[in-house]
Amino acid sequence: MPFMPVPYVIEQTHRGERSYDIYSRLLKDRIVMLGTEIDDDVANVIVAQLLFLESEDPDKDINLYINSPGGSVTAGLAIYDTMQYVKCPVSTICVGQAASMGAVLLLAGAKGKRYALPSSRIMIHQPLGGVRGQATDIEIQAKEILRMKAKLNELIVKHTGQSIERVEKDTDRDYFMGASEAKAYGIIDEIQNPRKVVGLGKEEKK
């Protein structure tokens, strides 16, 4: 995969010019970007940003933008638990796609503050796992996969209001949704019209 340089933003201050990488600049406006597959390193950065923003202002919203194919369940749950732990409401916005653990994080946003852009794609499914080794090891890993499957299904039920029977059926295979379908399912609350966005962390005044 080709290296993508990180853009920098130049700002004028009373001390002169100051440069920020784009993610640090977004963080100033309480915007966190999850734009990759989820692994432990990515989760640690997201968790650190959430905790930092809570320490800065525990009453102000955090905006978590998600464009992710999913990834590690345990890493994703670290982000999920932190979202529930911090005092700040965490608004989630899907741009592009929120699949697998990405979808779980999308639906875990503060109630009434879960959004997707019109062309977003959302996908839920059961955890994936490949196991090799002795029969006993395979049995242990299989039980753990089933435990994680039940855990994720419980979270989907909790945040969407769907029945466990429907969630178990839908997650048995890859279940794709557009923004409208995700809203009907209870994964998001609103489809965000990009034209309403007028600035970083700001919404159009009415």
Curated annotation (Swiss-Prot):
Domain of life: Bacteria
Localization per Swiss-Prot or TrEMBL: Cytoplasm
InterPro entries in the record: ClpP, ClpP/crotonase-like_dom_sf, ClpP/TepA, ClpP_His_AS, ClpP_Ser_AS
Main location, first listed in the record: cytoplasm
Gene Ontology CC terms, in alphabetical order: cytoplasm; endopeptidase Clp complex
SUPFAM superfamilies the record matches: ClpP/crotonase
Binding partners and assembly: Fourteen ClpP subunits assemble into 2 heptameric rings which stack back to back to give a disk-like structure with a central cavity, resembling the structure of eukaryotic proteasomes.
NCBIfam families, A to Z: clpP, PRK00277.1, PRK12553.1
Protein's UniProt name: ATP-dependent Clp protease proteolytic subunit 1
Organism, scientific name: Myxococcus xanthus (strain DK1622)
Top-level taxonomy: Bacteria, Pseudomonadati, Myxococcota, Myxococcia, Myxococcales
